[in-house]
Amino acid sequence: SSSNTIYWYQNDGSGGFGPEQIVTTIPASPNSVSAADLDGDGDLDVLASSSLDDTVAWFRNNGTGVFGTRRVISTLVDNAQAAYAVDLDGDGDLDVVTASFNDDTIAWFANNGSGSFGAMQVISTLANSARWVWAEDLDGDGDEDVLSASSLDDKIAWYENNGSGGFGPQIIISNNANGAAFVTTG
């Protein structure tokens, strides 16, 4: 929102939603927000990327829908456009993959299982103005491969995961996706 506030709305189970509840108000513009169990405790936490402060962070859910303070994963995601939670190294916890607009980088951060994350691991720097990331097992080998959308090169691409978090070179799906901003599967 324009107030840099992240909200959530509780589903009542019949398609209706309760009142707006604040997760956090952060000092920088959130670009992507999603829910994922990042600390392995069985409830959904909030993952967010912020473009103005180059930050990817998460907010721990205490189990009752109350969220803690911002837990920074990285402040090195240059103009952070997207963050997506997925198990990239096959250890059973959710890691985080990111898209950096200013430095054309697709990268990931390994989760230690309790919501602490390791250093940035670069997958590629060939996504010119990276806008979005997603993961799916594209080659049917049982691990999650990474997809990216980048706007200045009009590209949708993917990166083959070797099963333990190592990635092959960029494989272009299309370089005619005019101003590519999103990619998903389904």
Regions found by a protein language model. Give the residues of each.
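Blade-edge motifs of beta-propeller repeat domains
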Residues: 10-28, 60-78, 110-128, 160-182
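Short intrinsically disordered, low-complexity coil segments enriched in acidic
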Residues: 1-11, 16, 186
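Hydrophobic beta-strand segments that make up the repeating blades of beta-propeller
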Residues: 1, 46-50, 96-99, 146-149
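Acidic Asp/Glu-based divalent-cation binding sites
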Residues: 45, 54, 95, 104, ...
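A short loop-to-beta-strand structural motif that recurs across blades of beta-propeller domains
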Residues: 5-9, 55-59, 105-109, 155-159
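Extracellular beta-propeller repeat domains
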Residues: 3-5, 51, 101, 151, ...
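Beta-propeller blade termini
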Residues: 31-38, 81-88, 131-138, 181-186
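Calcium-coordinating acidic loop motifs
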Residues: 12-13, 36-43, 62-63, 86-93, ...
